[in-house]
């Protein structure tokens, strides 16, 4: 199977049996021709998964370098989010050897991948993704991704939001030294004395690098940076979570106060949760964990190709929403948005016809048909909707509100 067919078949992957996957693809691309499962998988094993990393990064670079693109920002900054997620994979001796065991001692083996992503929360694009073992060093992965993000976004200003448990003292120091703007939620035990001493909701705090704070890093690669100074400064912002002002979170940041007053930090940090939604889309809507096979190379191909399709879907949905911005915001009771599930479903079903079409004019016509159909399917965005969280398996196997896209 040629490389282009191999690539297109993975983009077109629907998570059904491999025989039916190949039958469907070959009927569209090469009617009357068949390929065996072993022959197809043999070709797949020769393809480096990094090819799909290059593919989605190429798309991202074009997206951010487009002079006509209207990028969503907050006070002129792209809002990036860094976080990790567990990806369930088939448990075999090979996957255990490559990725490790995620289960506790003396329990059944369970192979997992730790996926670390850097995400543009406002433009809904996955900028970078790294496959790791479970329980990986998320901050180290995030730092590497932040260091290379300029290759994708160019010289555009950005800030990074991170959850509690992400940055420690060395990471804070490196980001401050490199002039990387960040917002990180603190645990109650992080800089506990400084948190308890806060007299206002927005203060500049001097963090003293005492012996007890340094000892954890002695003899490690972080020793030099924690010994390079006696103190450093953080801005701590208290964000109240309810009207009674009984619950709050403390955020650590180095953002300038004149551009980001304390009042905007609730909304700013809330944007980080869009990365959790992006992970849900990958796993639920795009069925990322419904793998082609059990070999590590196949798993990584499926993960990276799914990220590529996700970014394409968001690019199209965002383009439609910008084109119809006034109509979607003003002509309905609620602000309207493109139905992401339907967008993904249409792309999974129809994108293959565009990829296989050799005539550029027909390609354009086919894409316009998909574009027009997606633009007609919009759903309301209802603000401040909250549902009580119930733990446990209360629903049936098939959700009535989250139907499959394809």
Question: Can you say where each PLM-predicted feature lies in the sequence?
Answer:
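Single, function-defining residue in the core of a domain
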Residues: 1-16, 34, 40, 44-47, ...
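Short, charged amphipathic recognition helices of the HTH superfamily
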Residues: 15-29
């Amino acid at each position: 199977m040629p490389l282009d067919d191999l690539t297109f078949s993975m983009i077109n992957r629907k998570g059904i049996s491999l025989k039916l996957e190949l039958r469907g693809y070959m009927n569209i691309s090469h009617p009357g021709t068949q390929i065996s499962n072993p022959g197809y998988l043999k070709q797949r094993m020769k393809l480096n998964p990094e090819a799909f990393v290059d593919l989605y990064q190429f798309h991202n670079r074009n997206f951010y370098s487009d002079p006509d693109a209207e990028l969503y920002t907050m006070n002129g900054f792209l809002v990036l989010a860094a976080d990790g997620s567990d990806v369930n994979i088939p448990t075999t001796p090979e996957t255990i050897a490559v990725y490790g065991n995620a289960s506790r001692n003396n329990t059944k083996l369970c192979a997992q991948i730790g996926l670390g992503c850097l995400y543009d929360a406002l433009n809904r694009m996955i900028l970078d993704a790294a496959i790791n073992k479970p329980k990986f060093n998320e901050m180290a992965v995030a730092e590497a991704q932040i260091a290379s993000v300029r290759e994708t976004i160019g010289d555009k200003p950005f800030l990074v939001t991170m959850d509690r448990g992400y940055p420690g003292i060395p990471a804070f120091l490196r980001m401050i030294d490199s002039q990387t703007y960040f917002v990180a939620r603190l645990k109650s035990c992080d800089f506990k004395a400084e948190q308890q001493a806060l007299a206002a909701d927005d203060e500049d705090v001097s963090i003293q690098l005492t012996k007890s704070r340094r000892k954890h890093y002695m003899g490690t690669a972080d020793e030099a940076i924690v010994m390079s100074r006696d103190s450093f400064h953080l801005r701590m912002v208290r964000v109240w979570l309810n009207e009674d002002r009984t619950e709050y979170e403390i955020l650590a940041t180095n953002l300038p106060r004149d551009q980001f007053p304390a009042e905007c930090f609730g909304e700013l940090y809330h944007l980080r949760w869009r990365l959790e939604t992006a992970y849900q889309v990958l796993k639920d809507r795009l069925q990322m964990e419904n793998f082609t096979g059990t070999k590590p190379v196949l798993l990584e191909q499926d993960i990276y190709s799914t990220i590529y399709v996700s970014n394409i879907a968001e690019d199209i949905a965002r383009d439609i929403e910008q084109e119809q911005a006034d109509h979607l915001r003003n002509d309905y009771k609620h602000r309207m948005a493109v139905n992401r599930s339907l967008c993904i479903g249409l792309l999974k079903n129809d994108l293959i016809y565009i990829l296989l079409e050799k005539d550029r004019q027909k390609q354009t016509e086919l894409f316009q048909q998909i574009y027009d159909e997606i633009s007609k399917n919009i759903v309301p965005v209802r603000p401040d909707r909250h549902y009580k969280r119930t733990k446990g398996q209360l629903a049936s196997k098939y959700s009535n509100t989250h139907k499959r896209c394809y």
